[in-house]
Amino acid sequence: MSSLRQSEIKRKTNETDISVFINLDGNGISEIETGIPFLDHMLHQISSHGLFDLKIKAIGDTHIDDHHTNEDVGIALGKAFSKALGERKGISRFGHFFAPLDEALVQVTLDCSGRPHLSYDLQLKAPRIGNYDTELVKEFFIAFVNNSGITLHINQIRGSNSHHIVEACFKAFSRAMRMATEIDLRRSDSIPSSKGMLENQ
């Protein structure tokens, strides 16, 4: 199964040069270097808590700012997930998780439906976490959903520390993605849709 549920994406523009490898049936092993330390930290959360093996290498124009690299990593990772899922046969399809981190609690609910949509409700008071612009969190997820074809709802239940809120978000996201992409043995080789198909981005 693992050999069928992995993919590699290479994406090069005038602004960034990115390669992503993902194994959906992995052990949470990651090698990540984007040039954006806080983004690296969040991507490690996706790998570790989702149990996805993940290799990401990005070179971008971070001397200008982090926006292009942050967005393009989201694009490439979304494409990698979509390619690894293929026709999405046998997957559970839906996932949800509540993740706490100290005072913060974030809920993520998602559907690997082939219908890209983001509802985003994080209230981040700090303009930056370290050197990372907190506006880029939403930009990352916009890029991801548009290229993975998932419906994603992110809801902050409570929290005051921006770092805690964002990290709880990524942890909840990783566990929800793990739940949604895992194989449902009762579905065997069928597509989890009454229509008989799910769009593949």
Swiss-Prot record:
Pfam families: IGPD (PF00475)
Keywords: Amino-acid biosynthesis, Cytoplasm, Histidine biosynthesis, Lyase
Entry keyword Protease: no
GO function term, MF aspect, one: imidazoleglycerol-phosphate dehydratase activity
GO biological process: L-histidine biosynthetic process
Annotated catalysed reactions: D-erythro-1-(imidazol-4-yl)glycerol 3-phosphate = 3-(imidazol-4-yl)-2-oxopropyl phosphate + H2O
Protein's cellular compartments: Cytoplasm
Annotated S-S bridges: none
A Gene Ontology term for the protein's cellular component: cytoplasm
Family (UniProt): Belongs to the imidazoleglycerol-phosphate dehydratase family.
NCBIfam families cross-referenced by the UniProt entry: PRK00951.1-3, PRK00951.1-5, PRK00951.2-1, PRK00951.2-4
Name by which UniProt lists this protein: Imidazoleglycerol-phosphate dehydratase
Lineage per the UniProt record: Bacteria, Bacillati, Cyanobacteriota, Cyanophyceae, Synechococcales
